[in-house]
């Protein structure tokens, strides 16, 4: 990477750090709280490609691991994201690391792949619409995979904690997190990406 690209990537990593460890990473929308942690990951993917996008996704996963291991280890669902939680009822395992890292890394891959495919299939040189679609898919990749892997590795434990059936959990998660975060990514990311490409 040249110096300009390196500085841009460092700036995005700094934003990701702020979003993951401060209240600035959460936007209250009525009773819903949408997180912004996926925004830098999607921006990195669309601006710099698969490699940097997956790197930012890995950093997001690392920050999540650090948060649940050292900052909130006693939270009832901390075991879902770290094998080192202090939750009395349940303990994490290798599945916790899969949940913590794999969805975030793949969420750094899908935006640029989908954007490129959409742009080519529509025979449109304007990549803005492709970036919008890629942003939505990237955000939903994280939401769907995190929830799906939680149900694979800790389905019974998670359902016990939230005291709801699987369909209710899916619906609540998509409505409270998936849709608002996808909308935020679709609105913010393409605009920021276009600006970064022109710098």
Show where each model-derived region lies.
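Loop-helix junctions at membrane interfaces
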Residues: 1-199
